[in-house]
Structures are given as structure tokens and as C-alpha cells.
């Protein structure tokens, strides 16, 4: 800022000119581009993809109840208060899962209640986190337990190198905590344990300060802090255990496993993480010119779109995947459950006005800020164009392939739903074994 210059004048006229201020209203309307008159969007063929299809769990509630009772029978004393972690992710059958966990703990004599265990999500506000649970169907009536929400935290332990461990005030007052989460590869770091029960215990239950101190560092240190954190937290005796679920590429629950305190962050969770990696859906093409994603959101991935699928991590110190090599990404929508939080919008290159209008920048920036180095590039604004068709045409025009060459285009529902995709003719000869073109 130049001394004595108003904010609105800081750029305009800086060199004695009368340049108009930035026209933000142009983004609201969407910028129109001069597309080649002969540009056409290629026709796409629907393809069923070969993905792992383990047997789904038919009754998630009963499975959760049974595994809790079987694994934790000797660890619960009558009247033990247990803070059960409810997350912001769109777990399949999440209400049934929590209800089964609650009933299982009650059957053992515990007195469970639910706390939002989601770091800074929900705008880093207690009412926002409660609202996020409710938007996912996790109301007190549905899960059969009281929900206690607060952003106040209590330091309960420190790692050997001095990092504090936090629990929210309600969880800290309980006899034990019990994280319940989907286990899957993480979007910011790689290790023996990534996203799952351990991360919810160390990060989710720690609210804003717990999340901020983990995400403040790079990918390798992030992994180490989480692993060291669970050791320190376990040593306090505050962890009863947890429940981890694994979903297939089609979004069906295929495993529900209760973990003891020793299992959380231990061999059992490592085994579940290895299994979860096998379930991660993949784009079966080494090079893609245009990837069209119909919807992203916090219930799909913490980063709106899962970089383990798109190949783009956009984190300093963490390399993008060699395959798929995606030239341009078009994101068409975000889910209502996201509440406008669009962390990860920076993965996209083009978005329509209809999506841009949904973004709550307060929520997005708070979440990105808490994510530290992982949030810097992921909050960048893509090109905003009037319509979905404009976005796709822009991607086709700017993907780096000559105008008269066939484009390698893939369209998916989301990075979580990958049992099928739609591809252009240029990719039909590269379909993997077992893929089936839908007539």
C-alpha cells in the first residue's frame, strides 16, 4: 500500500494513471471468452470401470453394535462417560454407524454422548459444527444421544518434543474419548496411518488449535506429529478405542471394525489403512486433457476433490502423482452439505458462476488457514465463467492439445463415486481390462 493512499486506490493510479479498480462484478457475471466458432464439445461414452467389489455390510448399525461389544467388553466400566466423535465427512450410513456405536457402548454400561470432532470445520464455530452434523443427518433424535458442541479446548498431554495435545472441553471432561471415522489415504501426507481414527483423535477432537498445529507443518512433519500425538494421547488413558469404517469405490461400507486403545494408531489401524488403499478409486488413464468433475464437497473429500484420484496435491513438499497426468480440471458444483466451504477449489482450473456463488469465503479461508501449508494453493480461485458449457470449452481450448487434435476427456460424478465414467472417443482404445462400454 502506498502511504496516504486509500485501499481502493492502491492499484489504480499507482503510477499516475487513472486505471479503473478491479471489476469484481465481472466474476459475478462470469467472464465471456472468444471461443473458436468451430469448437465442439466431444461426445462421451459411458464406461463401467473395473473396481474392487468386496461384499458390502448389509446392516451397518448391527455390525457397529456387535464389533463394539465384542472388542471392548473388558475395557468399559459401568457409568463410564464416553465422548464419541462425530465427523464432518459424508460417511456412508453414518447415522446407522453412530447409532450402532452408541447402542454398543450403552450395552457395555457406558454413558455415551457425541461431540463434533472436526477441527476447524463449520467455520470454527460451535453452532456451525453442530449444524454440520445435523446437515449430515446426525441429529440427537437420529443417533439416540446428546450432542455437546464447543470450540473451547483443554490441553491434556504433550509429546516428547513438547507439542501440546488438546481435547474439546466436553471431551476432556469425559472419562474416555471414542473417535468414529472412515479410514482412507490422506490428502496431505503419506504414512502407515493416514486419515482415520488416529487423525480424528489427534486433530478432530483438538478443534482449531489441535488442527492448526498439525497442519502448520509440511507433509512429513504432519505425519510425524500425528503419530507422536496418538502415542502421547494414549498414554493419558483417555482413549477407550474407536471404530473405523472402509468404503468401496462404489461408496458401500465393506468393513466396520472396533479398535481398542492399543489398536488406535497401532497394528490394527495400519492393516485397515493398507486395505483402504486397495479400495481407492483410480482414473485408469495415464494422460487426460480435460477432467470434468460433476460435484465436489466436504462430504466427498476434505479437499472437495480427492487428490489421490485427480493426481493434484498442490502442497509444497508433496509431489503430484505421475499418473494420472491431468492437464485441466473443470468442477461444476459443490454439495449442499459443504455449507459453502470450498477448500480445494484451487484444484480446479475452471468453475461456473453457479458454483462460485455458493462459496462461503469466510468458511473456506478459515479452513485453509487452519490447514497451513496444505491450504495455501488449494484456496486459489479458478477461472469463473458464465456456464458449465463455457468452462468445458475453455478447458478444451487451453488443455495444450492442438485445436484439430482429438481431446482426451473424462467426466466423473465425483472423486468418491468412481464405478463409472464418461470418456471421449480418443480414450476408448485405452480402456483397462474389464471395463465395459454402456450401449
Model-derived features: positions:
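N-terminal amphipathic/basic leader segments beginning at the initiator methionine
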Residues: 2-62
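Glycine-rich phosphate/diphosphate-binding loops that line cofactor/substrate pockets in enzymes
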Residues: 67-83, 106-107, 284-285
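Active-site histidine-anchored catalytic micro-motif
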Residues: 95, 111-127, 158
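C-terminal non-catalytic interaction/assembly regions of soluble proteins
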Residues: 3-8, 15-30, 307-439
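Catalytic cores of enzyme domains
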Residues: 169, 182-373, 382
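Short glycine-rich or small-residue beta-strand-to-loop segments that form or flank ligand, phosphate
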Residues: 81-92, 113-120, 410
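An acidic, phosphate/nucleotide-engaging active-site surface
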Residues: 128-192
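Histidine-anchored nucleotide/phosphate-binding helix
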Residues: 92-112
